[in-house]
Amino acid sequence: WQRQLLARQPNNAQGWRQLAALQQLSGSHDKSLATLRAAYQKGLRFNESELDNLVLLAGAADQPWQGAKLLAGMLDQGLLPRTSAREERLGLLWWQARERSKSAQVFRELAQRSGSAKHWLHLAQLELEQARWQAGLDALAKAERAGAERSKVRAWRQWAESELSYQREKHVASAG
């Protein structure tokens, strides 16, 4: 019945929201996301919390890449103000989408602004996942200075240093 209502009144924003809410309640996060995206593309406008919800729906629908693209676009276009929470969400969505370099860039900027141990640890983990050992070690040092848990930093540092040492030995062996 909700779709019939939309067919008769396609510019009724409330109808689109209701259909998306019903789809979300029934567990069809992907359909709810598609409904809201269709409404948005039709030119219907949403408030800030609805735009945030659209991004969250992408994550709930197991579409982190879509969520990251949506959020990045909304931030770049000024549709949503840049906040630390949104930047962190963007970094996590890129990470879930396996776009580690984009995620690392977001967390690097966020960590530099916030000085948060959590953000430095996220950056360190991303750098280490990409076998960027020295960059990971640098981020770990900053995380430790920012108050990160020493045992976690120590374990990651030992692993990164052993990998870096192995890479150097391998390089020396191949050069000789």
Predicted regions located by residue number:
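Alpha-solenoid helical repeat scaffolds
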Residues: 1-176
